[in-house]
Amino acid sequence: MRMIRRAWQQLDHAMIRFMRANGIRALRVALGIVFVWFGALKVAGLSPVGDLVAGTVYWIDPRVFVPLLGIWEIAVGLGLLSGVAMRMVLLFFWLQMAGTFLVLVLRPELAFQRGNPLLLTTTGEFVIKNLVLIAAGLVIGSAIRPGAAERSDETRSGHA
């Protein structure tokens, strides 16, 4: 029994070391891939949320706004993937994330069933899931050390 407990503790410690060494980098890369992918779909005019974006930000021509939003998202994604200028990247990330919630304010009929904020539509679920992306941004941002150079070895390794 003692051997099993010791083996379990060693495995547990190894797993924790692995997650500490790679978790933030993996989160940054995964978030970067999502942003590049979603942005590329908008630029190509193939995004399934293009109409939603156009209908939410109705005061700007969607032929201009949707591709520009896509370029913005690609830039955020590339920044996350590279780990360069993370403070600026995260600023753009936060601005984009704030924009995703506009539909809840400007077009609530698209997000909520029968006007009830507890009853989400598919669109509402799509928007609310961005809370997970926000949490990911918080974790990535929490790893940036105050005053650290933007492109240090720590930033590239995911521990900045």
Label each region the model flagged:
Residues 1-160:
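Membrane-interface extramembranous regions
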